């Protein structure tokens, strides 16, 4: 039976790890041991932050909406309540984009929310 040498496999694994560590600082980019630890940690951060990114963007949309709605004389919570009472089902992402790119259309939506609040309350 032929002797099995594993140099090719380990070299490929090491190369893959070092390529993933490109751009890291210090020994983390060129020693296998440090690079492996750094790459493992970076993958943990990446996994965690894919979830965190969703929260961060939602918070950004809410901040933008709050600022835009306050210019038109409402608060964010009253605006969302008014939209619910008016039956408008546009999500926060689209609303924040409207507030930035098409202020006239956004103003019309705010007026809808205001009128729904006036009739309901």
UniProtKB/Swiss-Prot annotation:
Short name of one Pfam family: Ribosomal_L20
Residue ranges of the TM segments: none
Tagged with keyword rRNA-binding: yes
GO molecular function: rRNA binding; structural constituent of ribosome
CDD domains for this protein: Ribosomal_L20
GO BP field: ribosomal large subunit assembly; translation
One annotated Gene Ontology cellular component of this protein: ribonucleoprotein complex
SUPFAM superfamilies linked: Ribosomal protein L20
Keyword tags: Ribonucleoprotein, Ribosomal protein, RNA-binding, rRNA-binding
Matches recorded under InterPro entries: Ribosomal_bL20, RIBOSOMAL_L20_CS, Ribosomal_protein_bL20_C
UniProt keyword annotation of S-adenosyl-L-methionine present: no
Its job: Binds directly to 23S ribosomal RNA and is necessary for the in vitro assembly process of the 50S ribosomal subunit. It is not involved in the protein synthesizing functions of that subunit.
Family matches, as PANTHER family: 39S RIBOSOMAL PROTEIN L20
Family: Belongs to the bacterial ribosomal protein bL20 family.
Name of this chain's protein: Large ribosomal subunit protein bL20
Species per Swiss-Prot/TrEMBL record: Beijerinckia indica subsp. indica (strain ATCC 9039 / DSM 1715 / NCIMB 8712)
